[in-house]
Amino acid sequence: MEKILVTFSTGAASIAVLAVLFTVPSLYNTINEVHDQVLDGVSVFRVETDSAWTEMMDIQITVTPPTKPRVNPFNSVFRQKRQTFSGLPAWCQCEPTKPTCPPGPPGPPGQPGAPGTPGAPGPKGDDNTATFAPLTCAPVSQDCVKCPQGPAGPAGPSGPAGPAGPDGQPGFPGQRGNDGFPGAPGAPGDNGQPGTPGQDGFPGQPGADGQRGSGAPGAPGAPGNAGPAGPAGQDGFPGQDGAPGPAGPAGQDGFPGNAGSDGQPGAPGGPGLPGNDAAYCACPPRSAVFLSRH
């Protein structure tokens, strides 16, 4: 009993160790995939927020009158780090694109703020003499998106069987079969009717007187030879038909029929699935890109 328990425990422990060895790499790969997906999502989110922030700043600059840019007082003390993108691949576009469309309609008015303290009256400003060219957008293309053809749909179901073909020409007559074995002799027929009695013969001459014998009677003689066979009787009535014999063996299989006609073509396949999203490249931090442009 103890040997059985030890063997069972050892087998269970071995199975558990093997399960752990096969499960840990799978969990590690799953965690790495989730980590990569999270990093990709964060990168996409940062790119979208940078683009939105840049568009908001451009709209604000377009709507509000141009003012003198604010100078960073620490530029004279600390040297600004130079941004370079020469180490990135050619397909990476890390700098935010500048919008070329006019600003949208103004948003709803916000909540009124608290009244501030009245400021001192400023000097009279100069008349504005600068003019700006109107902003125009590139024409929007109305062409349809040309997608690649989807994969072929599954094959349609088989069509119904075609109608049976016409009967063929009649075959040549077969050869005459061999004679069968002679039948068993029939049962003997019934006895025939008795014949008519013959005519009486003429009376014979009277015999001579015999002598009285004196001896004892002798032994009986041997039986005589059999007489000739009598005439054959009439044929008997035909016997009843015998019981049917057992069924013969099955004949050979017939020739295969002609192939049926092809079925109707299947329905066209559905539209293909959309392609995977394009991969994003790692971009520098938003603050450095924004400061380099503004």
Swiss-Prot record:
Pfam families: Col_cuticle_N, Collagen. It comes from the Eukaryota. Residues 100-133, 148-276 are annotated as: Disordered. Residues 102-127, 148-277 are annotated as: Triple-helical region. Nematode cuticles are composed largely of collagen-like proteins. The cuticle functions both as an exoskeleton and as a barrier to protect the worm from its environment. Belongs to the cuticular collagen family. This is Putative cuticle collagen 145. It comes from Caenorhabditis elegans.
